[in-house]
């Protein structure tokens, strides 16, 4: 099969396996031609229900009409401008306001309001930013995460990972990282005045969908 500018006669699947770095030993290698709603469609009439949903990105379904329309409207205005907040961009400002409104009822123990947003490109970047912010704001260095947690693949985020499987090939990692058991009330005593931040999944995913009590999170 020849697709796009491929004139070698090699199938897209083989090109995928040859030229794209694989993130798992056994990739699904499904050739997706298009996606609609909850389904992925292959080039030969195949149809698969997508239970991954872009790891949450496509939870409203693929090519949702409102999402497609919003993207088209933005394309007609401008694409990438600046990531450091130098320009006033209406969609970005509106999203920041909406996020801040969801946190209006919360404040830090010092009485600070959570009304400011820093946008990142990925969850890993968000974790890295949170680690840096916590250290800078508190002046402390200790970070606490949970065993079997997964927070990203960069050096800092990987240091928070609670499974040796993810960390073993990349040591030495960041110092002053401690791990506690997810959902265990007695483990919270390990959070001290040396702790800059506790990084936690509300529901652990990589560990097997572990749901803690509301009391534990509070």
Where are these regions (language model features)?
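Acidic surface patches and DE-rich sequence motifs
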Residues: 42
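Short, small-residue-enriched loops and turns at beta-alpha junctions
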Residues: 57-59, 88, 186-187, 205-210
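Catalytic PLP-binding core of fold-type I/II PLP enzymes
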Residues: 210-218
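PLP-dependent aspartate aminotransferase-fold enzymes
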Residues: 98-200, 204-206
């Amino acid at each position: 099969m020849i697709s796009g500018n491929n004139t070698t006669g090699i199938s897209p699947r083989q090109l995928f396996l040859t030229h794209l770095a694989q993130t798992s030993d056994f990739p699904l290698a499904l050739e997706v031609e298009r996606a609609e709603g909850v389904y992925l469609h292959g080039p030969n009439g195949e149809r698969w229900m997508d239970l991954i949903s872009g790891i949450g990105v496509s939870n409203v379904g693929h090519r949702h009409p409102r999402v497609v329309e919003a993207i088209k409207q933005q394309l007609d205005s401008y694409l990438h401008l600046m990531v450091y907040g130098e320009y006033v961009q209406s969609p970005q400002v509106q999203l920041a306001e909406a996020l801040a409104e969801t946190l209006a009822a919360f404040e830090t123990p010092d009485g600070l309001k959570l009304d400011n947003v820093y946008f990142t490109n990925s969850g890993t970047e968000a974790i890295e930013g949170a680690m840096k912010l916590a250290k800078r704001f508190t002046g402390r260095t200790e970070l606490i995460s949970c065993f079997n947690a997964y927070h990203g693949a960069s050096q800092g985020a990987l240091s928070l990972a609670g499974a040796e499987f993810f960390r073993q090939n990349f040591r030495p990692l960041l110092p002053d990282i401690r791990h506690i058991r997810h959902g265990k009330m007695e483990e919270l005593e390990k959070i001290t005045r040396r702790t800059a931040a506790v990084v936690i999944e509300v529901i652990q995913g990589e560990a097997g969908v572990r749901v803690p009590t509301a009391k534990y999170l509070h």
